[in-house]
Amino acid sequence: MALRYPMAVGLNKGHKVTKNVSKPRHSRRRRRLTKHTKFVRDMIREVCGFAPYERRAMELLKVSKDKRALKFIKKRVGTHIRAKRKREELSSVLAAMRKAAAKKD
């Protein structure tokens, strides 16, 4: 603890010391996407395409049935948070497809 104020009592009492800065734990980097993992996932997506439930969810998103799509995906993937993440992923894919189609024209 650093002696911020010259007082003998309280939180700031004691000797002046420098804080020992520790590296963040390795467990903190969990779920961070690496370049290799991203490359592999993109490759698999390109080869395999989308699952049938993902295609149906994309159709629901196309006709702006976002809530229905969320409920449908939640039923398939299990949890609300995973469903929201999947819906965001699919809507970003649709936006990219729209952008590519507009660029082509």
Swiss-Prot record:
Pfam families: Ribosomal_L36e. Gene3D superfamilies: 60S ribosomal protein L36. Residues 13-31 have a biased composition (Basic residues). Residues 9-31 are annotated as: Disordered. It is found in: Cytoplasm, Cytosol; Cytoplasm. Signal peptide: none annotated. The modification N6-acetyllysine is found at residue 62. GO terms for cellular component: cytosol; ribonucleoprotein complex; ribosome. GO terms for molecular function: structural constituent of ribosome. The keyword Glycoprotein does not apply. GO terms for biological process: translation. The keyword Cytoplasm applies. Belongs to the eukaryotic ribosomal protein eL36 family. Component of the large ribosomal subunit. The ribosome is a large ribonucleoprotein complex responsible for the synthesis of proteins in the cell. Component of the large ribosomal subunit. This is Large ribosomal subunit protein eL36. It comes from Oryctolagus cuniculus. The lineage of its organism: Eukaryota, Metazoa, Chordata, Craniata, Vertebrata. The gene is RPL36.
